[in-house]
């Protein structure tokens, strides 16, 4: 079974006041993703949270995601998704019972009985466990407890309640801050406070054949190859410009046989940072269609410096 693992789409994202929908970045990414989908033919698409950038998304963001889901449904590819901390779980899961009849499965809020979606391939059943963003108080409430004080114990308690058939292949979707034996994931500038949300050690997922994580924008494994953050498809901060962006492809064969690789997906605008004196910046050769962060290094800032740079770089957006 071939899976596309996505996360942190952040539809409706603004960067320095510019809409990534209006600037074309997110619609362009969807076009390129659909081309890759037609080329590689995944059996299912996983979205591990933060579909939207805000709990109350804009009309444009909702329309964009609606078009995206419609294209995937037309291709009859199952879509399995959870809510992240940026999403409103209730809003994201609106109409979930109707959507599941079209092969779109959404878990918006934590439940005592974790939603499980099962798909078949030539090797048998694959069970997908959908755990949207959780916090201890919510788990205490649904389990009728009051002793779960941190995120790690809350996740362990929730998973202990589930009947997981270990002889079958199991995949979990989670949107949390996951560490590997205390080692934290590599983050970017748009995630400066994410580490304070609460850590979960990756060994809590030991019973799962693949762990599809969201929450961190840099694509990376956490300890094992099969515990992975997909990362955001686009750079959402200039500090993310050198991060690994692409599409995480997972192939499940027989129990215990999992392979993972990254497919490149073109982006509309690259993020570039340049620095120097005004004279040096005006001589810099920069690729067309780029978002440029220009750092002027001189004691006196020239008058109308930003306007001058924008006139010099007419096909680029200067911040």
Q: Model regions: which residues?
A:
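Short amphipathic alpha-helical segments and helix-helix/interface helices
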Residues: 66-70, 96, 159-160, 201-205, ...
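N-terminal active-site segment of His-dependent metallophosphoesterases
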Residues: 1-70, 74, 172
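A conserved active-site cap/scaffold subdomain adjacent to cofactor or substrate pockets
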Residues: 202, 209-265
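Short, surface-exposed connector motifs at secondary-structure boundaries
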Residues: 73-81, 288-290
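His/Asp/Glu-rich metal-coordinating catalytic cores
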Residues: 57, 74, 83, 87-223
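Accessory, non-catalytic peripheral segments of nucleic-acid enzymes
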Residues: 39, 44, 252-319
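Divalent metal-coordination and catalytic microenvironments
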Residues: 8, 50, 65, 84, ...
């Amino acid at each position: 079974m071939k899976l596309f693992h996505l996360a942190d789409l952040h539809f409706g994202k603004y960067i320095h006041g510019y809409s990534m929908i209006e600037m074309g970045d997110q619609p362009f990414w969807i076009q390129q993703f659909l081309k890759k989908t037609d080329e590689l033919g995944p059996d299912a698409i996983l979205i591990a949270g933060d579909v939207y950038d805000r709990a109350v998304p804009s009309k444009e963001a909702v329309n964009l995601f609606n078009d995206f889901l419609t294209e995937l449904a037309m291709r009859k590819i199952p879509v399995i998704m959870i809510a992240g901390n940026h999403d409103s779980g209730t809003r994201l899961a609106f109409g979930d019972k109707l959507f599941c009849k079209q092969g779109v499965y959404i878990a918006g809020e934590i439940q005592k009985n974790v939603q499980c979606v099962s798909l078949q391939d030539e090797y048998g059943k694959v069970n997908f466990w959908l755990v949207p963003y959780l916090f201890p108080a919510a788990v205490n409430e649904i389990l009728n407890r009051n002793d779960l004080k941190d995120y790690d114990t809350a996740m362990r308690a929730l998973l202990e309640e589930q009947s997981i058939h270990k002889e079958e292949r199991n995949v979990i979707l989670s949107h949390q801050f996951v560490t590997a034996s205390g080692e934290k994931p590599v983050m970017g500038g748009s995630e400066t406070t994410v580490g304070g949300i609460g850590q979960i050690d990756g060994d809590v997922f030991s019973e799962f054949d693949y762990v599809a994580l969201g929450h961190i924008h840099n694509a990376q494994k956490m300890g094992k190859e099969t515990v992975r953050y997909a990362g955001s498809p686009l750079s959402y901060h200039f500090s993310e410009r050198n991060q690994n962006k692409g599409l995480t492809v997972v192939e499940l064969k027989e129990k215990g046989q999992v392979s993972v690789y990254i497919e490149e997906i073109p982006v509309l605008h690259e993020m570039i940072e340049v620095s120097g004196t005004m004279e040096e910046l005006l001589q810099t050769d920069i690729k067309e269609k780029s978002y440029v962060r220009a750092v002027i290094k001189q004691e006196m800032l020239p008058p109308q410096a930003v306007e001058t740079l924008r006139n010099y770089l007419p096909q680029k957006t200067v911040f």
